Amino acid sequence: MSKDEYLITDKPLKALTIFAMPMILGSFFQQVYNMADSIIVGQFVGSSALAAVGACAALTNVFICVALGAGVGAGVLVSRYFGARNYSKMKTIVSTSLISFCILSILLGAFGFGFSRLMMSLLQTPADILDEAVLYLQVYFVGFPFLFMYNILSTMFTSIGESKIPLGLLIFSSVLNIFMDLWMVADLGLGVFGAALATLIAQGVSAVFSFLIFLYRMRRYKCRYRWFDRQELQLMLRIAIPSVLQQSTVSIGMMIVQAVVNPFGTQALAGYAATMRVENVFSLMFVSIGNAVSPYVSQNLGANKTSRIKKGYRAALLLDTCFAALAFIVIETLHTQISSLFLGKDGTALAYQVSGDYMRWLGYFFIFMGIKMATAGVLRGLGIMRPFLIANMVNLAIRLSVALIFAPRFGIAFVWLAVPAGWLANFLISYAALRKSWPTDETERAVS
């Protein structure tokens, strides 16, 4: 057995822990990427500039989710072929997806750059921060192909059980991003433009190195393969499109929520933006475990070891419970200090109140996010995308309906009060579908 095959040979809890920890650390440094802009801009430029950067978050997440959803489609198939040791098909799907998504990323980047001002205006971005928000967004879209391709390559690495290489690259690029942020924002005084440019350069370096290392990594699998295969592309898109729709629709929903928050003013937006960054940091633990479960399930399905799938799911739930407890303790103890990292001395009482209330509410219910992510990860690994999509749409509908109906009338708190209910509904729908879809001996024979 190759050492790369530990996801189908080691004990499930051990395998998932070894696999997920570099992904969690990698996701942490991915958020450091994003947080560096916010913290440095907030400390050295001011809360208005922080609000400008934060106002872009919901929109940029839509485009990031297209990349993540596309990676899911390719990653599930790469994992399955890797588990079955069908390296010819594995390399074919890798090549096909990289060519297809490279073209897509360039088109999306051009679209985003050209329509930045229109999109931010439609989101009701406050007039006093609109120009800075548009500037940040346009620089972001110039570098979007790098971000897109890095996310695809990172998924490829994890699909073959290699999560340490993306971690190393993220640490390097995150450190580079922070130093360039400090230089361009604090020393050169380039403000929001400097923060966006620093991130663009760091993403570009990370994407190029990822491609070169992955190309070298693939050389160990000696086999013939096709550069582009339409049938494999169609198979990949059957999985990728529901995932893209799910993730993009959720992010579009968050854009609508952003539009609900914006009329409350710049300071409320600054507090909301600060906690959105914190939510992203804590949620990465649960997202990473869900992302680790998918290739674990897919590899074991491809290797005809379906009895390990349920054990892996239980192991993921255990890890999620531990991380939810940790998140609660940290937030309950340090929520004010965490808010001050973003808001600094310039933050008003309103900004701190919004940030603190939102953060503490999330801390009570992160366990719901954890169990829904683990369940969704199993569904993705099995290629069962319809209930996965439905569950996320219900989650979004609950969050949007409460925010749109109640927040304008009764206050900004209703933007986040419905979040745990959406997570719980998502889990219940996903789990009901999963109970009907556990692989059986017949599944093993069909896969083989």
Name each region found by the language model.
Residues 18, 41-61, 127-132, 192-193, ...:
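Interfacial/gating helices of multi-pass transporter permease domains
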Residues 18-37, 139, 173, 202-206, ...:
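Transmembrane helical elements of multi-pass membrane transporters/channels
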Residues 28, 32-50, 120-127, 183-190, ...:
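Helix-terminus/linker motif at the lipid-water interface of multi-pass membrane proteins
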Residues 62-65, 177-181, 206-211, 281-284, ...:
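Hydrophobic transmembrane alpha-helices of multi-pass small-molecule transporters
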Residues 71, 140-158, 166-174, 195-208, ...:
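Short runs within selected transmembrane alpha-helices of multi-pass transporters and secretion channels
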